[in-house]
């Protein structure tokens, strides 16, 4: 009975727990986060929509963790803006990135893809 009372008092903060902490056996090390192996990229999908309603092609590929290049040069400015808004939401929802490559061309990349750019140095 005294053991139960002691546990209740420790739980309520009215007493200190005097149990000794044991260190981990010498063969064990501290826990650490192991990085996930990077997936190999074997495909990039290039998409040339002519109207906004063709957006489902982007979704299917991006859900499969395939980077998508979207060339919106054939879209009206209104549809291009809608497509960018949709692609931005898609990339945020699936933890990806969206970057402008040039003009109306954008790269939608999944989380596991790292993009590096070369900055032009001013001379």
Swiss-Prot record:
One Pfam family recorded for the sequence: SepF
Superkingdom to which the source organism belongs: Bacteria
A GO biological process held by the record: division septum assembly
GO cellular component annotations of the record: cytoplasm
Chief localisation class: cytoplasm
Gene3D superfamilies listed in its UniProt record: SepF-like protein
Transmembrane segments: none
Keywords: Cell cycle, Cell division, Cytoplasm, Septation
Entry's localization field: Cytoplasm
Family from the record: Belongs to the SepF family.
Function: Cell division protein that is part of the divisome complex and is recruited early to the Z-ring. Probably stimulates Z-ring formation, perhaps through the cross-linking of FtsZ protofilaments. Its function overlaps with FtsA.
Known partners and oligomeric status: Homodimer. Interacts with FtsZ.
PANTHER family linked: CELL DIVISION PROTEIN SEPF
Designated name of the protein: Cell division protein SepF
Source species of the chain: Tropheryma whipplei (strain Twist)
Gene of this entry: sepF
């Amino acid at each position: 009975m005294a053991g139960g009372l002691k546990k209740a008092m420790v739980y309520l903060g009215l007493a200190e727990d005097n149990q000794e902490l044991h260190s981990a056996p010498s063969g064990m090390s501290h826990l650490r986060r192991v990085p996930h192996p990077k997936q190999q990229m074997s495909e990039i999908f290039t998409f040339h929509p002519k109207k906004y309603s063709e957006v489902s092609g982007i979704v299917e590929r991006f859900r499969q963790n395939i980077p998508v290049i979207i060339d919106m040069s054939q879209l009206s400015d209104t549809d291009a803006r809608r497509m960018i808004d949709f692609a931005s939401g898609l990339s945020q929802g699936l933890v990806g990135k969206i970057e402008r490559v040039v003009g109306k061309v954008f790269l939608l990349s999944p989380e596991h893809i790292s993009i590096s750019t070369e900055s032009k140095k001013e001379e």
